[in-house]
Amino acid sequence: MTMDGDSSTTDASQLGISADYIGGSHYVIQPHDDTEDSMNDHEDTNGSKESFREQDIYLPIANVARIMKNAIPQTGKIAKDAKECVQECVSEFISFITSEASERCHQEKRKTINGEDILFAMSTLGFDSYVEPLKLYLQKFREAMKGEKGIGGAVSATDGLSEELTEEAFTNQLPAGLITADGQQQNVMVYTTSYQQISGVQQIQFS
């Protein structure tokens, strides 16, 4: 993921969200105006303006719905407006995390956001419970990528990652649960592209 040297955020405009500096060290997330002069408008080949479609700005709603369905009973249903609400929230969350990671790059005068920047941003923004398992995933992913290059690409990175992410590897990394505002305990859900089932970890498979 790359960013321009003069930019204070990375591709935030593509998510329909802008980020501005306050005091040179903080971001404020602001929605774009939904007007004809919005940054989401562009000129087509005929010179007329055409707004970007929602599917071009947000994550595919089918993928969002698939993840949501994994958290409800098989007989449960999800209303369209609920899917659209989560779709927009997820896109804003991506911009939120990326903006914080971008600020770190800006301070260190780097142009590329790496995995450590994302983990640092999540820790800074209060998502500490997810940092350790994601750190482990990032480490295993990089090891799998190195192995792929070493053997000429005969084994894909995700295959190598699937083999190394065992139940034992996650035993001491995942918290038992999260405590919500009402005092209820929630299980931690980890989203991976690995097809190996890990006992005690609920996984979402992406096709």
Curated annotation (Swiss-Prot):
Domain notes: Can be divided into 3 domains: the weakly conserved A domain, the highly conserved B domain thought to be involved in subunit interaction and DNA binding, and the Glu-rich C domain.
Listed PANTHER family: CCAAT-BINDING TRANSCRIPTION FACTOR-RELATED (PTHR11064), NUCLEAR TRANSCRIPTION FACTOR Y SUBUNIT BETA (PTHR11064:SF195)
DNA-binding region: 59-65
PTM summary: Monoubiquitination at Lys-140 plays an important role in transcriptional activation by allowing the deposition of histone H3 methylations as well as histone H2B monoubiquitination at 'Lys-121'.
Quaternary organization: Heterotrimeric transcription factor composed of three components, NF-YA, NF-YB and NF-YC. NF-YB and NF-YC must interact and dimerize for NF-YA association and DNA binding. Interacts with C1QBP.
GO molecular function: DNA binding; DNA-binding transcription activator activity, RNA polymerase II-specific; DNA-binding transcription factor activity; DNA-binding transcription factor activity, RNA polymerase II-specific; DNA-binding transcription factor binding; protein heterodimerization activity; protein-containing complex binding; RNA polymerase II cis-regulatory region sequence-specific DNA binding
Start and end residues of each stretch annotated as B domain: 53-142
Gene Ontology annotations of biological process type: cellular response to leukemia inhibitory factor; positive regulation of DNA-templated transcription; positive regulation of transcription by RNA polymerase II; regulation of DNA-templated transcription; regulation of transcription by RNA polymerase II; transcription by RNA polymerase II
Listed InterPro entries: CBFA_NFYB_domain (IPR003958), Histone-fold (IPR009072), Transc_fact_NFYB/HAP3 (IPR027113), Transcrpt_fac_NFYB/HAP3_CS (IPR003956)
Role description: Component of the sequence-specific heterotrimeric transcription factor (NF-Y) which specifically recognizes a 5'-CCAAT-3' box motif found in the promoters of its target genes. NF-Y can function as both an activator and a repressor, depending on its interacting cofactors.
Chain segments carrying region Disordered: 27-52
Gene Ontology CC annotations of this record: CCAAT-binding factor complex; nucleoplasm; nucleus; protein-DNA complex; RNA polymerase II transcription regulator complex
Native source organism of the sequence: Rattus norvegicus
Region spans: Subunit association domain (SAD): 86-97
Subcellular location: Nucleus
Covalent crosslink: Glycyl lysine isopeptide (Lys-Gly) (interchain with G-Cter in ubiquitin): 140
Name of the molecule in the record: Nuclear transcription factor Y subunit beta
Protein family (similarity comment): Belongs to the NFYB/HAP3 subunit family.
Entry keywords, A to Z: Activator, DNA-binding, Isopeptide bond, Nucleus, Transcription, Transcription regulation, Ubl conjugation
UniProt region (A domain), positions on chain: 1-52
Ranges for region C domain: 143-207
Biased composition, class Basic and acidic residues, residue ranges: 39-52
Record keyword Ubl conjugation present: yes
